[in-house]
Amino acid sequence: MRRLLLISNSASPGESYLEKAGPDLNDFLTEADREQIILVPYAAITYSYDEYVSKVNKALEPFGIKVHGLHTYDDPVAAIKQATAILVGGGNTWVLTATMQRLGLMEPIREAVNLGIPYSGWSAGSNVACPTLMTTNDMPIAEPESFRTLGLIPFQINPHYLDKAPEGHGGETRDFRIIEFVTQNPDIFVAGLREGSRFLIQGDEIEVHGENNVRIYHGGEETQEMMPTGDFSFLLQEPSREEAK
């Protein structure tokens, strides 16, 4: 049974790091899950992987959760195969994807999740759980082998979702860019996941944690604003065609 906790962001303004996600991770991870938690830190750009691991451990220490950076292992594929839980941190989705592909991590992580190993990611870490990275907000500062990512879910997430442009902004809005995506890929749902929101997926059940609505996009349909208490099960249905263009 797949077990996923997909988080929009690590912290909102005025919050400490993983303030909202920490309690959810505590509920999400069993005692057995905590034996060997691997953190994939490759989205970090302006700070070191060691600093990233330290920051995550400091935030999760009150919950008795300790992570081990994947970068510290000589054989990262073997480390993934031995993991009891996998966390993928935020940062730049393009760099994260390129590094995961180069190290041959996509299939081992996919296999681990299919075997029931819990997976949680925030921001870029939720992006790579999708079929592709096409709905990331990040600048493409690295070139991956392809846009294909883990495909742990059949829909796309846009984390840090904002439906309104900042005051004085004259460029494309997030809303317009996602409409472009679903126009080009009409069978793929996109969930605009506002900050402070998380998807919890266990098997064929999905729910939203957080107070904010989720905006749903689908080709040829009006966008929908759905309350966190809504039925999101349709997002887990496989699209009628195999994958996005």
Language model region names:
Residues 81-82, 115, 152:
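Alpha-helix C-terminal capping/helix-to-coil transition sites in glycosyltransferase folds
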